[in-house]
Amino acid sequence: VRPDGTLAPIRGGGALGTFELHPNPKLDVYFNYGVEYAYRTDFNFTNVAGANVSVGYGSPFFNNSGCELAPTLPGGAFAASNNGACSGNTRNIQEGTVGFWHKFYSGPKGNLRWGLQYSYFVKNSWSGNNNTPTAVGVNAKAVDNMFWTSFRYYIP
């Protein structure tokens, strides 16, 4: 949203690629990579009180001071408490995946396959310094390593 209240589209882009190998009739190996990106769409203005105000998406003046803090649990509660300020506007998301499927039975009663997959996921945010020009902006980064296994039965 612009300072005058009108909507401002967020430009972005993305890509996805896949590479597959079939070294033999019983084995399929695959590699996938995907990325999405959102550009900064930020605006600054002075409000009626004379203060500088940042609006929009990905402003370098947003407060990200709490983005690198681990949430703490208050006494006896099961939900995480507020860990501070973190606008955390997403800059990009990337994921790489590698896996395989092995067909270990194929017959008149159907097909049985098993597979393994590993995925590496990264989310980066736009940096923000809480409208403090002398401060270095904080940009949060989240990383997730994932492993899956699966068994499939295909009806004939």
Please name every model-derived segment.
Residues 26, 105-114, 156:
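Short loop/turn motifs that connect adjacent beta-strands in outer-membrane beta-barrel proteins
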Residues 1-7, 40-90, 125-141:
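Solvent-exposed loop segments that connect transmembrane elements
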Residues 33-39, 104, 118-124, 153-155:
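Transmembrane beta-strands of outer-membrane beta-barrel pores
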Residues 14-46, 96:
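Loop/turn-rich, solvent-exposed surfaces of beta-rich toroidal or solenoidal domains
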Residues 29-31, 96, 112-116, 147-149:
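Transmembrane beta-strands of outer-membrane beta-barrel proteins
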Residues 108-109, 115-134:
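C-terminal beta-signal and adjacent terminal beta-strands/loops
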Residues 9-15, 92-96, 141-147:
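Residues that define the transmembrane beta-barrel architecture of outer-membrane proteins
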Residues 15-21, 98-102, 116-118, 149-153:
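Residues on the lipid-exposed face of transmembrane beta-strands in outer-membrane beta-barrel proteins
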